[in-house]
Amino acid sequence: MKNRKRLVAVSTVVIASLAFTALTVPAKAASEINVLMVGNPQMKDLQTLTAENFTKDSGIKVNFTILPENELRDKVTLDVSTGAGQYDVVTIGMYEVANWAGTGKIKSLDSLVAADPSWNKADIFPSMINGLSGTDKKLYAAPFYGESSMLMYRKDLAKKAGVTIPLRPTWAQVAAAAAKMNDKKNGIAGICLRGLPGWGEQFAPLTTVVNTYGGTWFTKDWQAQVNSKPFVDAVSFYVDLVKKYGQPAPTQAGFTECVNGMAQGKIAMWYDATSATASIEKVGFSKHVGQFGYAYAPVVKTKQSGWLWAWAFAIAGASKKESDAWKFMSWATSSKYENLVGEKLGWAAAPDGKRASIYANAEYKKTAAAYYDVVLGSLKAANPLNPGVQPRPTSGIQFVAVPEFADLGTAVSQEVAKAMTGKQTVKQALDKGQKLAEKVAAKYKK
């Protein structure tokens, strides 16, 4: 009898212990997805906020892989081209959509969007929807944040140097300002311009300079123009400006290096993505919050020269987790997520540039007062169908929408980098680039 009582008591303890364990051990996520992202500040914020605000509610665990821009592009291309299926969600932009839509490399989102009215497609800027849709008019990627390009500068340093930056500057005015604001004694470069090789690194800003100088990669009938006078003049100006007044080790500086330099007070001016405000105006990251001025992308022969881009999420064609992938994408690209970032991290950090609603938000408008008009104006003015002074063979401001452009742009950027370091002249670099461009053009000439 005593043994029986002891057995019952022990059993009761075991059952209670198991029950307690079940209550205290976190439940395993119902599903897991793998997401590949570029290592920009907005994505790092997303990684930080996901577990507590998405996984907790959805039960979907998100495994992030974050890479520098050039490495990301290579990794995404390899994964979707081979159908490896290592990632469910990949980070791409308008260039990739133009080349991959309808190929099976990435999935159409139309049915998912139609079944998810809370995502509110109508709130997304038409330029973002159009840029992330294929020729079949189907949407292939959801924009996380959108951007154009603009000039950013330290107001206090400009005042100290006796410089006035116009709201709509020319590149000649920018060069003159960089000369006056360059302060090597105090470790401050007059300007930062991307020199890191890569079609989406160095040649993102540089192609906009080419455009406004009157140049183009190709004419409408596919005549290569890489060593034409306007192209050479633009690249010569860019390289000369960097060599005289630019950041140290220019060929190692991409977006990340320039944004860090600007935030840490090592750079007086910077021409780059409008989305950089999420970093340089972010309390805790930037040492100079509230000290920046903003102007439209500098011009020479065109009325505007800002680019148009979106970092966006797409579902890899080989993914077997389409539903869970969309749940994550829908949440991350929603106005609800923008509000979450605004409340948790500050409105300057919100991934803007894609939804009309955030530009009507009073708290956002208050925080973004210094750059609100320039950013919104730049996004509205950007015209991928007419970015220069002549007709083009494809749409795109800072890229040519053909698969070969990624390799072409990167190869030419490597030659330009050699010119930046004095290993060859700009003309020599672009003569080499012309030969490469002619090979691409030959595939498309009729």
What residue ranges belong to the model's regions?
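Glycine-centered hinge/linker elements that transmit conformational signals in sensory
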Residues: 177-180, 220-252, 293-297
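Conserved C-terminal helix/tail region of periplasmic/extracytoplasmic solute-binding proteins
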Residues: 61, 159, 383-446
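A structural signal for short loop-to-beta-strand junctions that line the ligand-binding cleft
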Residues: 78, 86-90, 117-157, 189, ...
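C-terminal lobe and pocket-closing loops
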Residues: 114, 275-288, 301-410
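Short, well-ordered beta-strand elements
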Residues: 30-41, 60-65, 88-89, 140, ...
